[in-house]
Amino acid sequence: MLDRDGFRPNVGIILLNQRNQVFWGKRIRTHSWQFPQGGIDRGETPEQAMFRELHEEVGLLPPQVRVIARTRDWLRYEVPDRFIRRDARGHYKGQKQIWYLLQLLGHDWDLNLRATNHPEFDAWRWNDYWVPLDVVVEFKRGVYEMALTELARFLPRHEQRNRYLRSGMRTREHESSGQASLARTSSLLVKPGMELPPGASFDPDPQNSVPAPLEALPTLPVPKKPLDA
């Protein structure tokens, strides 16, 4: 279902834990990390689609989250031709999205990447709120920045300022090869003897899963699964 401009209606989900970190998933059998998202089916409202995608991709049910906010308008991004199925080229242009900010009310072990027979992710982790802007595939970076910026006003004030602190430290973080991020992940996530949720595995530093530096992100390997959701 496309609009007259070739954009597919879609929802994006920013899921927060109690530390105001965001859920970050690795697309199955690829090196690509992203927020949960998915298309709006005919007859669905954006909120209905959001709850469906939340269960399909993360395994959560409506009582396990609290809806904090959503973006006011559609946010659009265009998908490069190399990521579009050949039979859709020429009329499919990209996604237009309503983004939701959710608070997890349960626990990490409530997340289940195998809630359906068609999983979207094969690994996940919690990231600081602004980290996805550093590592998401380039053609999504603009819409991620718009969504994160619009919804950041619902975070505690110090979390909003962290965006600018990260911007100033970005060069030094890359020069240190992600060691600070790895240490932060180890201290917050992978506790000794911790039992992972069903279908979950942790990549301690998804920034280092990308085989190219940040400036070379457009040359990321093409996912085997066409990016049409």
UniProtKB/Swiss-Prot annotation:
Name of the coding gene: rppH
Assigned EC number: 3.6.1.-
Record PANTHER family: ADP-RIBOSE PYROPHOSPHATASE (PTHR43736), DIHYDRONEOPTERIN TRIPHOSPHATE DIPHOSPHATASE (PTHR43736:SF1)
Protein name: RNA pyrophosphohydrolase
Domain (Nudix hydrolase) ranges: 6-149
Highest taxon above the source species: Bacteria
Hydrolase recorded as keyword: yes
Motif extent (Nudix box): 38-59
Natural source organism: Acidovorax ebreus (strain TPSY) (Diaphorobacter sp. (strain TPSY))
